[in-house]
Amino acid sequence: MQMQTSNARARARALASGRVTRLLSQPPVAMQMAWLMTDGSILTQSQLTRQNFYRYSPDAKGDYAAGKWREVGSLQAGYAPLAFASSLLADGRFVISGGEYNSGGKYTLQLVNLGAVYDPVKMTWTALGHPHGWGWIGDSPSSILPDGRYLLGDKLHEWDAYLDPKTLQWTRASDAGKADFNAEEGWTLLADGTILTADVKNAPNSEIYDPATGHWKSAGTTVVDLHSPTPDRDCVKYGPKPKDCYSAPGEIGPAILRPDGTVFYTGSFSGPQGNGAGHTAIYYSKGRKAGKWVAGPDFPNGDNAGDSFAVLEPSGNVLVFGGSGALYEWNGKTFTQVRNAWAVGPPILLPTGQIMMLAASSTVLYNPPGSPNASWAPAIKSYPKSVVPGKTYKITGTQFNGLSQAMAYGDEEQNPTNYPLVRITNAAGNVYYTRTHDHSTMGVATGSKLVWTYFDVPKTISSGVATLEVVANGIASKPVKIVVSTARR
């Protein structure tokens, strides 16, 4: 009770400081995770039923503090997962796979192998099958690859599989070289298209996966141990057979690729008893130190980020959610607690650069300090000078996908934001997020490479002179002028 009172006071101070804004329209039910859709809306999952999903959209001025909620459908019967793999596809659809828990399960863990795909245009869910031979998926790591394929790891094995977004068919990938099973590991997409992970079972080893070769290889030791020992000394049942018993290897914290090419990796509790401060480590993915790990600072206050969240702020700093509820910020040199702010729930990075934190009745927007380096922004090269409501257009440029996936949560419920949004603002200050889709890449830090996406102009948009921006990871391009015409072309 004392901790709850302390947290309540901290939230009150945060609201008073101006760093945090409380939503005027709170969620109709408690939500447990959030994903940014390509039309600027936020998809959330009901904490109560776990089958029902909602979308939250900003108001006419683009203000996320004064938006509206609407229910947008339910998963298929028998599938109400908690802690699953997830991501947006390049065409704008949303995919989920597995689930550590599922409503109505017979065992302590369910590790279900079900899945589903959400179509944001039709607002419908379609059941998704599992890779051949995968009896269990659970809370598995996943990532969208630069070529648009969805890569999923099997929690209980070294297995990996690709989902073809066009056919929604799975193909078993090579897992050659994988040092341990995928359980509790998080995957971080690097600029060269490879995936970095810090092992949990085989800690402090780290590994790199190359989709081009289908091989894993060691990325060396993380120097400090980032994983915590499991509190469950006995295995946990997830199926009817005697062998269907899971021995957890422990937990680890989230990892974020920063604009300078370093990956800030956070740890869970340290020490054999799991009661020490979490460690951190920095991986250099480019430059003269490429492929090297160095130890970072320990968490202040004896805290840690085991199975928690991290967000890349537009400033390039990493916001980390401590297990205590405190927020910490890594700026590349120092790791300090954030004053006048508190972690109230799962986060999502918004196109405004704000960070929404979900809570049952106190969902807030965190306003991070600082601003991005101008060189990190998307740059528009070619675009339609005139657009018509209801029509689709192509826009090209550079760095449309940002410099990082920008979001991380341990080993499951991935919600990266490395895809372009197109925002149109008219002379009256009304903001319209178009729906983008069919991005040419889902990579990160694409540099001077020419990339593109398509955007659907809303049918409700007002005619007249307007500005258009491309936004990635909360960082907007320089605006360009367009004309919204009512004439059909």
Please report, for each region that a protein language model flagged, where it lies by residue.
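Immunoglobulin-like IPT/TIG beta-sandwich domains and homologous Ig-like subdomains
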Residues: 23-32, 39, 43-45, 51-64, ...
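Beta-propeller and closely related beta-sheet repeat lectin domains
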Residues: 31-34, 82-87, 138-142, 184-187, ...
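Residue-level detector of Asp-centered blade-edge/turn motifs that repeat once per structural unit
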Residues: 36-39, 88-91, 144-147, 189-192, ...
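A detector of repeated loop/turn-to-beta-strand junctions in beta-rich toroidal repeat architectures
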Residues: 50, 66, 83, 109-112, ...
